Amino acid sequence: MPPRTPSTPSTPKPPRVAVLADSDTRWKWGALTAGRVLPGSPVLDGFLLRGRATPTPRQLREVGARADSLREVTAVEFLRVMARESYDVLVLALVGGGVQAVLHGLGRVWEGRGERPVVVTGYVGVVYEKLADGLLLRHGADLVLANSRQDAERFRAVYEGVGADASAVTEVALPFLGGAPYAGEHTPYTVVFAAQPSVPESREGRAYLLERLVRHARLHPEREVLLKLRSKPGEHTTHIEELPYQKLAQKLVAPPNFRLVYGNMGEVLDRTDLMVTVSSTAALESLHRRIPTVVLTDLGVREALGNHHFVGSGCLASWDQLDAGHRPAPDEEWVARQGVAAGGAAGAGAGGGSYATAFDAARERIAELLAAPALPPLNPYYTPTTAPGYLPGILARHHLGPDGGPLPGAPAADKEPGPVRQIVRRAARGAYRHGVQRVAPVIRRMGEL
């Protein structure tokens, strides 16, 4: 592998960073994180891991994160790129199993090389389930980013509890917070419900939330009521959406002040007066901008919904309360612990201006590692010795063997796929998405008869 990006005092070169992501939201997190933790304007090469959630061109445009280059790859193809290309930093914006597989693959392709990229990983939003599993699958990166003080404490406790090195845990904040602070009501007053692909999962739960949103629009004809959707039918996001709200909405007669909207969440928040959700990360974006925010309790406060994360936030409320005009006030101490306390401008709200320094620790740590003459080998907690019944399956999903090398028959990476192969891949992905959103629910209903 060639040396990292060379530079001289007279001709400094911008840092070079690679981001590997497996969905639209993780691409957004990875690309924006790279911009937050590196100085200047880094040269960013994006890689989209081929799979069920590979974002479409429309989703990439909506996310808004830009790259100097962008290509779709398998894990094996990506590892071959890492073996021959030079980067300063690598951001792994993947589900936990993907991170673990790539870490083991990198360990093999970088074997015996002290000069390698600094490897960074983390979470795209609220961590409310599979805490230990997800964290241990991310162990081995040089930095494991925690989006709040609370998460940093929990992450360290998990690593230390299993005897793993916890020094990689680094407190930051969500990289996509920002935008103008809320300055008062708009005309018309706008209520936004941030939908989630898999929360709630049941048809009954999703139909109930949609019906209540439409009812709110009828009760308040002076308000604009928006259903903010993550994806269009046939597209996938980080989580599988079996019952799109678009499909459920076809059966409703909605009032004229109710609409379905897409687009960048930041732009939607620019006109929002009341953000409503079950447990979407959009709630944290809204709280950061001091927009009145509600986390719904209608379906209970449950781990399965993720809204238990907001216990103590002051934001929990029901549709009945909202219909009656309730506007919650967030608990400032809770908000500060989530890393979203800055209210836009310095001095606004609790911890105003703190977001500007939220990434300092990560920048300093990366600078230290880049200045080191050599970096140690990647050392994940999971190995064939510590997890012999778990790790091989994780690696095999990405066509990697127990040693991190490609399995026999793994897709070739020496050349770009031909036109026929690309068409077959797109057709297969479309068939999978059709099966998830149309065939699977029918089969499930038949099984309940």
Region annotations inferred by a language model:
Residues 262-305:
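A donor-sugar binding/catalytic signature common to diverse glycosyltransferases
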